[in-house]
Amino acid sequence: MKTAHSGNIANNAYLVAKFLRRLGEDAHAFHFRHEFIMGHPEWEDADFEGSLDPFDPPDWRTISFTNGFARPDWVHYLSGQVDPYVLPADAPAGAATRVMAALYTDSGSPAGGIGAQVRAALGVLGARYNSLARVNQLSLREAIEFNVLALARLAVEWATGFRAERAILTTPRLRVLLAERDAINATSRLQESGQRATMPILAKCPFWPSYRGMALDYELLQLYGVEAIKGAFLPTNVPLVAFEHSTMRTLPFENTIQGRLLNLAYRTADACVITNPDVVSSAKRLGLRNYRFIPHPIDELKYSPPPDGAETAIRRELRQSTGAELLFLCPTRHEWSNAFDSKRSDRVIRAFSRYVADSSHPKAALVLCRWGRDVRASEQLIADLGIVASVVWKPPMHKTRLRDFYRSCDLVLDQFHESVGTFGTVTAEALSCALPVIMYFNPKVHEWCLPEMPPIQSALTEEEITARLSELALDPARRLAVGEASRAWIIKWHGWERCARDHLSVHTQAIDSHQGSSSR
């Protein structure tokens, strides 16, 4: 069985493909050159020194890996062109690739030509817009700059969409894309629903041209997160599995281009994989019949306690630099809002301040990662609470380094938003490393899919988080017992082999159903 996995948010496509290959499925993972760095396989499995900008992935060929990692030959960049696999040698990387796609220009145009100059200028402006969009606490000057860039972005989007849809000043590349649009309108899930694709609609779906070509080479496509939208452009005879990754809660019900397309893709997929148990209500609202809960697979061999049980060099250095006896790790992004995907990291900081203020507690340090929209607000809150000396900031850490920090800390704090009550990879990885995890966990939303609840130390409010910190800090035996139970639970319910076999079962059923339909 040869399958394609695309939409590598948090390396899900890469990990599922890797584990499926261990079971004999010829699984291939696809991602984008400009993708957020946490969607690159190197971020998951390579070890390297230094820190990188998560929003500007490097040319990995220039990075020296200290653990001998080599990119597997079953991992591919998706070009975003009708030929899905290889970008032209002279095509730009990073943000400039998106600009090239948005303008429908050809990468082979003269270096000094107006097309190249416009691409370069818009690439700079686009990068600035994106950097400002990632910050909630903008200065007045930054806010004005952001709004001006947003208006310019809308103007360029409208102009290019108008030109493309009406085939004005066509380039060879644009003519190929128009033909691909026509193919979608001739036969696809979108066409069978009575709708048609236009270039302005397709422009909202980056890399859309690659998916029909990819489908010719694989028996099944599994599309992750919002990439499931591209399933709407595939013919109905292509087996399709949609992988939910916090993308079924609200997006399919929004009256937007992406919302409507994702709604259609979920409803016409052969199967939907749910990773967040709370979205079962959304699956029912969509009228889905073939959905299945499969948790994020965890490689329990990689995410494990220190092999020899000895103090790690990281732990030794952190304790010496802070004078702390205990280390609390919170690697999640800084997001204070009440949006469904918020982490409410402000509650972690305030709870830790309460912990520090109690002199009966063992001295502790809080390790945070500097990423998320509210980093500036978190820095200010830490200063206002007077706990700067007890907080250690680290850049976003690749997973091998993060695993080493798990092995060096006493417990992990994750997310504390009342509207979710489920966990993602941070909690699962920490549990696998035999660490107690404090987060908000709602057992009720898991009852339909989990026969046994994890030993998560649930908390929601600042007071509850402080209480969990206190209980675990004052009782080393309890920390050890909770950690051991946590690892046992992960191995039983989240282990890589169990999850991979579930995916394999879904794929087999989807392909068999198509073969049965074609034989009738």
Predicted regions mapped to residue ranges:
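Nucleotide-activated donor-binding/catalytic signature segment of Leloir-type glycosyltransferases, i.e.
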Residues: R376-P396, L411
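Donor nucleotide-sugar binding/catalytic pocket of nucleotide-sugar-dependent glycosyltransferases
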Residues: R249, N263, R267-I314, G323, ...
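Active-site proximal beta-strand in glycosyltransferases
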Residues: F30-F32, L220-G225, F233-P252, A271-V273
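Conserved donor-binding/catalytic core segment of Leloir-type glycosyltransferases
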Residues: V273, R315-K343, I349-R354, V367
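A charged, aromatic-enriched C-terminal amphipathic alpha-helix characteristic of glycosyltransferases
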Residues: A477-Q509
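Membrane-proximal helix-turn-helix segments that form the acceptor-binding/catalytic region
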Residues: C205-L216, K230, M248, F253-I274, ...
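Short hydrophobic beta-strand element within catalytic cores of glycosyltransferases
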Residues: S432, P436-F441
